[in-house]
Amino acid sequence: MKPEQFVHALKEKGINLSEKQTEQFYIYFQELVEWNQKVNLTAITDQEEVYVKHFYDCVTAAFYHDFNQEISICDIGAGAGFPSIPLKIVFPQLKITIVDSLKKRITFLNHLATKLELSNVAFYHDRAENFGKNKTFRESFDIVTARAVARMSVLSELCLPLVKKNGVFIAMKGAQAKEELEVGKPAIELLGGEVEEIHTFSLPIEESERSIILISKKRQTPKKYPRKAGLPNKEPIE
């Protein structure tokens, strides 16, 4: 997907990018490729692939949920900033918090935010399990997102504790989403969530399957969750 195809594909979905936003995506691509030589950020560095598999893929969340308002988003394990930085470029009024366990990635994100002239972005070098226990952040976000970080049973324990009541957890997954969801349902319910919608679609041009799962936060998460770092992955709630 060439940059101009990216702009056109979003336009078809009712998202019109300004020249500044188009330029921000191009700078993002350049910085990603340059920094990737010294920090492991992505296996995808070809321009056309970055535009479809990273940029377009991230913005698909906005096809199924309204981001056109002043809302706070926490992105767990964002790595190189996916999905929250592409969403922030498209919807500048969003308040973004990114949590990642690798310091080098946080350094990249701070640099990127400066280059892209982004405001209302905060980056935390922390484990999601510890961050979710922090009273300042626990149950404080309108939306929590994660993109292909872990399977649903694990992801729910990392993300749902951070979602405020009546907020939304948006999980961005690949082709295996429905199977993962079946296994993950006990965890979702235990942690106060309820599956609202699942959307499955193919990316344009290269046609790999994607799923977006919307989970609403109906009840407070029990205090014992998330458990200590490493345990959700080692002993998932299933």
Curated annotation (Swiss-Prot):
A Pfam family of this chain: GidB
Q: What InterPro entries does the entry give?
A: rRNA_ssu_MeTfrase_G, SAM-dependent_MTases_sf
One annotated GO molecular function: rRNA (guanine-N7-)-methyltransferase activity
Residues that hold S-adenosyl-L-methionine according to the record = 77, 82, 128-129, 147
Keyword annotations of the record: Cytoplasm, Methyltransferase, rRNA processing, S-adenosyl-L-methionine, Transferase
Q: Where is this region: Disordered?
A: 219-238
Subcellular location as annotated = Cytoplasm
What EC identifiers does the entry list? 2.1.1.-
Q: Which GO terms describe its cellular component?
A: cytosol
NCBIfam families referenced in this protein's UniProt entry, alphabetically: rsmG_gidB
For this entry, the protein name equals: Ribosomal RNA small subunit methyltransferase G
Q: Which organism is it from?
A: Oceanobacillus iheyensis (strain DSM 14371 / CIP 107618 / JCM 11309 / KCTC 3954 / HTE831)
Question: What lineage is on file?
Answer: Bacteria, Bacillati, Bacillota, Bacilli, Bacillales
